[in-house]
């Protein structure tokens, strides 16, 4: 990881703000992407008699030695390494190491979380310390929305351990619930997000935690309680990733913040809500002929018919005109997810992610033909879909015909 890369993971502004206002991780986790706000204070404490909480279940081995997780009274965390005999202590693993007579301590920064993921997945491809897309997670899963953070993590881990089954153990809508960029939050630039289920707009990041912070805390919890030793794969869903509309300008930040998510929900509702379908049969045919590659049109038509659906040519052109702008933007976002992960993660396991196609925040019901065309295009465009969420016609707090 070079110096340019580390600037991406510089959260000094939010860490300074939290420290200056005595907002410590112990009582308010997951605001900062880092799980160590004051490394100087932490290391100064090591010079005396360290009063650290040691999480014995967090231990694991790598080629460098034995690692474990420790925490000070403010909630700042560190990775502690007992170096194996014969290992050169100048090895490049995590950053900002502080050496004592017995151990080397590294701050639990988000940058070091990236480094640790690479270190573990390179040395042990079967590790389940981090969210992945493997096992049956792409076929059947249960998404657990994370609303209570510290209460949530241990409860879900306990359930998975008893079931012997991996789940989508952390699920949040971003940027609606989690803060997509802590610097934008500090600058007062967070916007509002449509929330049709309750019939209004809501503030961005209204849960008050960053997507990176929630990711970090969820992973650390699995080390603390020893879940990483159980051999159970689990996933993290970045839910309702908005595609298009006013969210175009922040998509690079969404991509960066969700780099650990092994399950991405592509919410095409914002772009579809703004798309205007040509009115005449001729105009629809002209749009498709001009905008959509002919081989893609033919391949999509074949997939739709193989699903037992036979829209007329005009109906098919209308559907293509409706969904094509959103699918193009989805492809751009998908490529950005893949490129960002390839840049920062060193294994295929670390880069892979599941995809969900979502349009469930549009009013009304999604027709089978609309769903089929969108799925056909997604697969033909190199974006295999694992889950789909069509609009199902139910909106919270809005009268329904049979609601007596």
What does each model-found stretch correspond to?
Residues 1-343:
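Alpha/beta catalytic barrel-like cores
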Residues 244-246, 272-275, 363-367, 396-399:
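Short, well-ordered, mixed-charge alpha-helical segments that flank or form enzyme active sites
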Residues 174-178, 358, 393-395:
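A glycine-rich phosphate-binding loop feature that marks nucleotide/adenosyl-phosphate handling sites
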Residues 325-391, 400-404:
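Gly/Pro-rich turn-and-neighbor structural signature
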